[in-house]
Curated annotation (Swiss-Prot):
Described purpose of this protein according to its UniProt entry: Catalyzes the decarboxylative condensation of pimeloyl-[acyl-carrier protein] and L-alanine to produce 8-amino-7-oxononanoate (AON), [acyl-carrier protein], and carbon dioxide.
Name of the protein described by the UniProt record: 8-amino-7-oxononanoate synthase
Pfam family, one: Aminotran_1_2
UniProt-listed Enzyme Commission number(s): 2.3.1.47
Organism, scientific name: Escherichia coli O127:H6 (strain E2348/69 / EPEC)
CDD domains, A to Z: KBL_like
HAMAP family per record: BioF_aminotrans_2 (MF_01693)
Keyword annotations from UniProtKB, A to Z: Biotin biosynthesis, Pyridoxal phosphate, Transferase
Family as reported in the entry's similarity comment: Belongs to the class-II pyridoxal-phosphate-dependent aminotransferase family. BioF subfamily.
Modified residues (N6-(pyridoxal phosphate)lysine): K236
Pathway assigned to this chain's UniProt record: Cofactor biosynthesis; biotin biosynthesis
Gene: bioF
Any Gene Ontology biological process: biotin biosynthetic process
């Protein structure tokens, strides 16, 4: 098979399965409204959970940062790209989340890949939740360490896997709030089992940080656990982009020596770090509390109105509210019908989610109003 034949076969297989991904160029994709092809839609696909991507204070912080530092960092943090803005953000994140250190990365994907690649050796073992994010599972599969997956949120299964002999160290990997299902991991139980087997715990809290817990400190704070490795990302609750790894002093020093994604990548622009500092300030403030309270009220309103629809609806209260449809084609058709009626909703299909669980992944944000939720419910009832 030639290169072209290989590529054509892979694309054809996705088309036949109604699983071919497509991008849509938008004029505005975050916040309450999505604008595409000169049309305006209520946006129920954004991860901008607190509606901070258009916050004037954060925008101005980025502008002032660009005026002060320029538009790029100029290099890796190990060369010339680690600015006082980066240092200040790391210190503020560490203080906020109760860790000794924080290290910045250009994305959550890069952070997860870097940590697992740097920490794991062939004699070690990775034990990951089966529904962990693609960045975690890909990093684990590329690692020299064996990967074992435990059934989703099944602590008993996790304990059995950890109990089997391992010549090296064991790293348990999970998420705080799962990106496609919107449910939370039982972190306290997972940490207890992990500690019983002398393992370390790594939690990716991309969808919890900023959104839940006191001052938006996320899933681990809410469940009163402190994993050895906590990954937080800035493209969701913070409304910006990038990520950080929270850890001890010695682990941070280790990652600075061995995390290749950190060493050999240009660091995020200092102006972005300034915007993130402003975003963190909002998240920790009374305004942040108000936005989280509003989001919770919107979620309650949505769940009360969707109970009688013929979709599988999980019992969860996160900003991610998936409606399980099952069939790929039907999920695509429903998403298109909703768009035709002014609601931008994304159909998520395998391989992103397990076969037979195609869904409408609805996300609610603090930028929405109650009438937006009522309109979404009206459209869903008309197409259920």
């Amino acid at each position: 098979m030639s290169w072209q034949e290989k590529i054509d076969a892979a694309l054809d297989a996705r088309r036949v399965a109604d699983a071919l991904r497509r991008r849509y160029p938008v004029a505005q994709g975050a916040g309450r409204w999505l604008v595409a092809d000169d049309c305006q839609y209520l946006n129920f696909s954004s991860n901008d959970y607190l509606g901070l991507s258009h916050h004037p204070q954060i925008i101005r912080a980025w502008q002032q940062g660009a005026e002060q530092f320029g538009v790029g960092s100029g290099g890796s943090g190990h060369v010339s790209g680690y600015s006082v803005a980066h240092q200040a953000l790391e210190e503020e994140l560490a203080e906020w989340l109760g860790y000794s250190r924080a290290l910045l990365f250009i994305s959550g994907f890069a952070a997860n890949q870097a940590v697992i690649a740097a920490m794991m050796a062939k004699e070690d073992r990775i034990v990951a939740d089966r529904l962990s994010h693609a960045s975690l599972l890909e990093a684990a599969s590329l690692s020299p360490s064996p990967l074992r997956r435990f059934a989703h949120n099944d602590v008993t299964h996790l304990a059995r896997l950890l109990a089997s002999p391992c010549p090296g160290q064991q790293l348990v990997v999970t998420e705080g709030v799962f990106s496609m299902d919107g449910d939370s991991a039982p972190l306290e139980e997972i940490q207890q089992v992990t500690q019983q087997h002398d393992g370390w715990l790594m939690v990716d809290d991309a969808h919890g940080t900023g959104v839940i817990g006191e001052q938006g400190r996320g899933s681990c704070w809410l469940q009163k656990v402190k994993p050895e490795l906590l990954v937080v990302t800035f493209g969701k609750g913070f409304g910006v982009s990038g990520a950080a790894v929270l850890c001890s002093d010695t682990v941070a020093d280790y990652l600075l020596q061995f995390a290749r994604h950190l060493i050999y990548s240009t660091s995020m622009p200092p102006a972005q770090a300034q915007a993130l500092r402003a975003s963190l300030g909002v998240i920790r403030s009374d305004e942040g509390d108000t936005r989280r309270e509003k989001l919770a009220a919107l979620i309650t309103r949505f769940r009360a109105g969707v109970q009688d629809l013929p979709f599988t609806l999980a019992d969860l209260c996160s900003a991610i509210q998936p409606l399980i449809v099952g069939d790929n084609s039907r999920a695509l058709q429903l998403a298109e019908k909703l768009r035709q009626q002014g609601c931008w909703v994304t159909a998520i299909r395998p391989p992103t989610v397990p076969a037979g669980t195609a869904r409408l992944r609805l996300t609610l944000t603090a930028a929405h109003e109650m009438q937006d939720i009522d309109r979404l419910l009206e459209v869903l009832h008309g197409n259920g």
